[in-house]
UniProtKB/Swiss-Prot annotation:
GO terms for biological process: auditory receptor cell stereocilium organization; chloride transport; diet induced thermogenesis; inner ear receptor cell stereocilium organization; neuromuscular process controlling balance; protein localization; response to dietary excess; sensory perception of sound. One of its GO terms (cellular component) is Golgi apparatus. The active G-site contains a monothiol Cys-X-X-Ser motif which mediates glutathione-dependent redox catalysis. Members of this family may change from a globular, soluble state to a state where the N-terminal domain is inserted into the membrane and functions as a chloride channel. The redox status of the active cysteine in Cys-X-X-Cys/Ser motif likely determines the capacity to adopt a soluble or membrane-inserted state. A conformation change of the N-terminal domain is thought to expose hydrophobic surfaces that trigger membrane insertion. GO terms for molecular function: chloride channel activity; oxidoreductase activity. Residues 1-98 are annotated as: Required for insertion into the membrane. The keyword Transcription does not apply. In the soluble state, catalyzes glutaredoxin-like thiol disulfide exchange reactions with reduced glutathione as electron donor. Can insert into membranes and form non-selective ion channels almost equally permeable to Na(+), K(+) and Cl(-). Required for normal hearing. It is necessary for the formation of stereocilia in the inner ear and normal development of the organ of Corti. May play a role in the regulation of transepithelial ion absorption and secretion. Is required for the development and/or maintenance of the proper glomerular endothelial cell and podocyte architecture. SUPFAM superfamilies: GST C-terminal domain-like (SSF47616), Thioredoxin-like (SSF52833). This is Chloride intracellular channel protein 5. Component of a multimeric complex consisting of several cytoskeletal proteins, including actin, ezrin, alpha-actinin, gelsolin, and IQGAP1. Interacts with AKAP9. Interacts with TPRN. TPRN, CLIC5 and PTPQR form concentric rings at the base of stereocilia and may form a complex. Interacts with EZR, MYO6 and RDX; the proteins may work together as a complex to stabilize linkages between the plasma membrane and subjacent actin cytoskeleton at the stereocilium base. A motif (G-site) lies at residues 32-35. Inhibited by F-actin.
Amino acid sequence: MTDSATANGDDRDPEIELFVKAGIDGESIGNCPFSQRLFMILWLKGVVFNVTTVDLKRKPADLHNLAPGTHPPFLTFNGDVKTDVNKIEEFLEETLTPEKYPKLAARHRESNTAGIDIFSKFSAYIKNTKQQNNAALERGLTKALRKLDDYLNTPLPEEIDTNTHGDEKGSQRKFLDGDELTLADCNLLPKLHVVKIVAKKYRNYDIPAEMTGLWRYLKNAYARDEFTNTCAADSEIELAYADVARRLSRS
């Protein structure tokens, strides 16, 4: 049995509604990398869908009945409620398929795990209250970012040209897996954006300028509507971490 929109000769778009976390005002997009991940996937698929922001402080009764006990993001696909982000991603990739919809899976397995430990290192760094631990935790974050930078600067197999010489060997690709956004980017970029905004605001930490691959990656991401138009406002992200980012003390 298949849910494919093209099954049985039915070429109509499925009915999809994505429910994402609302911001402080109860209406705009809130800080939620998982919501943004699904928002980006649907946008990149080119499928028609509706987006509803959910105010967690006053969740409407009809939404409570739709997905009881579930926080956004979740979606309805032709009336069926789906709540697990990883399973939703897998379902959309298997259901919204070529020729009608683009394949978004990364071709290289390493692209799916690039930057995988950045967010956990960032969380430990930003939640720390002890001044004496700050430098070590900052180094941990920088090391994780550098590992991602190395991956982005290392040519993918298809980029390697036998005629390439010397300092021209570095990768110039736009994203993790090439010049097109993939599921790997939809997972990593929302988290990377949060790290960039919050670390600067609460620890005055900048991603090092010498990480040219990482900055190239971010620059290319910010040039894409699928990313920038699904981001929460910087102030929204900062507010979300106001109680999480602890003030450092010497005690």
